[in-house]
């Protein structure tokens, strides 16, 4: 038998797989979230004022970058008035140097992009577990170095390395978990990880509220990472990866170990060798030379880019909405939680589906951001304006989180099996580019306080409009080959209990109405009518 059949014997989601889910989808995501949004707290600018030599107070910090800062007269010293420290107060990242805070976030997301590209190939060659464990160990190491570095340039370097490890390690951990459980539980595991990432944002805000030293905070959050690393040393290698490598004996041992830990009683089984795949390998030219795939890919690249840009942009802007930064950040994370069950319900509803759900959430997310510019923010206007800004920002975060969750599922259904991984990889790359740009958007407040939200809103609405040009994939068979894209698709429509053919034509599709395709559709419809 093959791995999928063996997993049904040993348990698709038994006691031990629940433990693996808790480790890789809960604890690990709680830790990953803290590193992903670290800069939202350690990069906050405390209140400060300038003083000159004759009015220097004890404990004030000399401005070593005075030439870059807008000082007046003989002002040579900065006094930070906040009750917390950050990289801004550590290295005087104010005035002309304020942009470097955004740079520190961008280099992190640049590292994530590199990590996603490299770690996938490394795990395919050397295995899921060793690459995941090594990546997690290096991430914890680099993160501690990041907290202890004495100079800002070294802070940027270690931040980049943390991004490489976090992005790559998280991807491999996700694959490892999915390959140890039954395929029917993949969506649940993915949604669980997304929800715990959101909780991790709120958790980081809570820790930051009590620990006001940025160095101590950056060190202590890695205690959780070290704990996950210790527990990860004893997890098994992916049986699916071992099977794909032809290491049948080791794959069988891994499956038997899962069964024992699940306390399952099962008869012995033997894995048969994997059949060679005769399909040719695809490349990026395959996608862009096909008119249908090219159309879908261009739209999805923009949608992924916007989802990442707005998601991380709103998260990083949580401190710019007034009120308590820790409360804003915690609410920004918790606001995501309702998004996941809501979008899972809507995308499977026959009257809504994938396309309308994605477009609707993007419209609502973008519209919420655009409405912020209508909220009056004037001195003495009262707390209502701040409350409205916060509420609309949280509503935007909820909707864009739902869009982000949908786009993963929707994208995988738009591509044929022969190019699915490649297509998802291209879209994911543009998502990372959105993350790299996101830290710089909040800086547009210096031009106009509402400009960042106008950018987020316009991007969200434009992505929603473009997504309407994509086909619906709910209850539509997944395409296996490029040829399947040319065949008129069918969908199960519950109208008086009968099945009806739904023509689905896209720009660039070739509908030559060949008798072969019509015969194939007739056979499929007749077979379905017997159900």
From Swiss-Prot:
GO terms for cellular component: membrane. SUPFAM superfamilies: MFS general substrate transporter. It is a multi-pass membrane protein. It is found in: Membrane. GO terms for molecular function: transmembrane transporter activity. Glycans are attached at residues 52, 58, 83, 512. One of its GO terms (biological process) is monoatomic ion transport. Its main location: membrane. It comes from the Eukaryota. The chain crosses the membrane at residues 22-42, 100-120, 137-157, 161-181, 191-211, 216-236, 297-317, 327-347, 357-377, 387-409, 424-444, 450-470. Pfam families: Sugar_tr (PF00083). Keywords: Glycoprotein, Ion transport, Membrane, Transmembrane, Transmembrane helix, Transport. Belongs to the major facilitator (TC 2.A.1) superfamily. Organic cation transporter (TC 2.A.1.19) family. Probably transports organic cations. This is Solute carrier family 22 member 15. It comes from Xenopus laevis (African clawed frog).
């Amino acid at each position: 038998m093959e791995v999928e059949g063996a997993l049904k014997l040993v348990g698709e989601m038994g006691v031990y797989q629940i433990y693996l889910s808790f480790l890789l989808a809960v604890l690990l995501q709680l830790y990953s979230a803290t590193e992903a949004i670290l800069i939202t707290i350690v990069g906050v600018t405390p209140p400060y004022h300038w003083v000159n030599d004759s009015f220097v107070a004890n404990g004030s910090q000399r401005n070593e970058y005075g030439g870059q800062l807008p000082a007046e007269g003989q002002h040579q010293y900065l006094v930070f008035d906040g009750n917390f420290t950050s990289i801004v107060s550590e290295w005087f990242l104010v005035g002309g140097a304020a942009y470097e805070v955004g740079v520190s976030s961008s280099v992190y997301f640049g590292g994530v992009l590199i990590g996603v590209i490299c770690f996938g190939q490394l795990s395919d060659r050397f295995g899921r577990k060793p690459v995941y464990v090594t990546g997690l160990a290096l991430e914890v190491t680099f993160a501690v170095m990041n907290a202890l570095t004495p100079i800002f340039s070294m802070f940027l370097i270690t931040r980049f390395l943390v991004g490489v490890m976090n992005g790559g390690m998280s991807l491999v951990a996700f694959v490892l978990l999915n390959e140890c459980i039954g395929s029917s539980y993949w969506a649940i595991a993915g949604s669980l990880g997304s929800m715990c990432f959101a909780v991790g944002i709120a958790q980081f805000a809570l820790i930051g509220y009590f620990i006001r030293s940025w160095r101590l905070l950056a060190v202590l959050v890695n205690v959780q990472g070290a704990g996950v690393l210790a527990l990860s040393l004893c997890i098994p290698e992916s049986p699916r990866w071992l099977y794909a490598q032809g290491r049948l004996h080791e794959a069988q041992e891994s499956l038997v170990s899962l069964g024992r830990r699940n306390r399952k009683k099962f008869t012995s089984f033997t894995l048969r060798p994997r059949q060679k795949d005769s399909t040719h390998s695809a490349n990026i030219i395959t996608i862009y030379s096909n008119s249908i795939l090219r159309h879908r890919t261009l739209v999805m690249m923009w949608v992924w880019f916007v989802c990442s840009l707005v998601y991380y942009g709103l998260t990083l802007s949580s401190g710019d909405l007034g009120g308590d930064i820790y409360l804003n950040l915690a609410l920004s994370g918790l606001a995501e939680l309702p998004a996941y069950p809501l979008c899972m319900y809507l995308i499977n509803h026959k009257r809504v589906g994938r396309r309308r759900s994605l477009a609707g959430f993007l419209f609502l997310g973008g519209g919420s951001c655009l409405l912020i510019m209508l909220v009056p923010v004037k001195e003495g206007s009262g707390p209502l304006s701040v409350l409205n800004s916060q509420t609309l920002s949280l509503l935007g975060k909820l909707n864009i989180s739902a869009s982000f969750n949908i786009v993963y599922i929707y994208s995988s259904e738009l591509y044929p099996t022969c190019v699915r991984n490649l297509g998802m990889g291209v879209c994911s790359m543009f998502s990372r580019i959105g993350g790299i740009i996101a830290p710089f958007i909040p800086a547009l407040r210096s031009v106009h306080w509402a400009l960042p939200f106008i950018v987020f809103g316009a991007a969200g609405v434009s992505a929603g409009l473009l997504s309407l040009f994509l086909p619906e994939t709910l209850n539509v068979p997944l395409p296996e080959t490029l040829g399947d894209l040319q065949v008129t698709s069918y969908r199960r429509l519950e109208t008086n209990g009968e099945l009806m053919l739904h023509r689905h034509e896209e720009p660039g599709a070739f509908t030559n109405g060949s008798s072969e395709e019509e015969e194939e559709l007739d056979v499929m419809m007749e077979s379905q009518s017997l159900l």
